[in-house]
Design a protein with these regions (language model features):
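Class I SAM-dependent methyltransferase SAM/SAH-binding core
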Residues: 24-26, 30-78
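A short acidic, Gly/Pro-enriched loop at the edge of an enzyme's catalytic core
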Residues: 77-88
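A short SAM/SAH-binding and catalytic strip from SAM-dependent methyltransferases
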Residues: 87-100
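C-terminal helical/coil "lid" or tail adjacent to the Rossmann-like core of SAM-dependent
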Residues: 165-186
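Conserved class I S-adenosyl-L-methionine
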Residues: 119-142
């Protein structure tokens, strides 16, 4: 299991922020990535559809003393921002919640400045059998789960839109009980 500190440290190293970036985390939940990169960028906007999540992240950001953070209630499939607004767009464990993941992907592409960085951190199915198993488990623990995308589906999303600079797939072993406990699954 990869700890929060391990993946946020990895994210910070990967984005190579210069300190002047306007950043956005889409479908942010408690904006784990956004809060982690906040010290390294000019500002971070956390967007989520769920007001309860935004209230949680506001409290967390205040506790952590993060000043350069803002919160927006909005739909990832129709982002409430002008074209080419952000230098860095991040989404973590979100695309598997969308029936049509290309919609939020296109929106993230639209609001990203030319030459900007898009970071997608999500589960990837390496085989159809693994996808079916993972989807069954994810659906039990999270009823908003739709399906895990395959590597080929991710590649198709990026194919025409971006120059891929870093692609990394890491096998992260997860204890089933601790994974289910995250959402209080019986």
């Amino acid at each position: 299991h990869m700890s929060k500190a391990e993946y946020t440290d990895y994210l910070i190293r990967s984005i190579q922020a210069k300190g002047n970036e306007h950043a956005l985390e889409v479908a942010a939940g408690t904006c784990i990535c956004g809060r982690a990169v906040a010290p390294y960028v000019k500002d971070i906007t956390c967007l989520d559809l769920t007001e309860a999540m935004l209230e949680q992240v506001k409290k967390l950001a205040k506790q952590e003393g993060i000043q350069n953070i803002s919160f927006v209630s909005g739909n990832a499939e129709c982002l409430p921002f002008e074209d080419e607004t952000f230098d860095l767009v991040i989404t973590r464990l979100s695309l598997h919640h969308f029936v049509e993941p290309e919609k939020p992907f296109r929106e993230m592409q639209r609001v990203l400045k030319k030459g900007g960085k898009l970071v997608i951190w999500d589960m990837v199915a390496t085989t159809e059998e693994l996808r079916e198993t993972n989807d069954a488990i994810e659906t039990m623990r999270d009823n908003s789960h739709t399906r895990i995308l395959s590597r080929e589906e991710f590649e198709a999303l990026f194919e025409d839109a971006f120059e891929l600079q870093l692609e990394e797939t890491t096998l992260v072993p997860v204890n089933l009980q601790s994974w289910m406990d995250l959402t209080s699954t019986p």
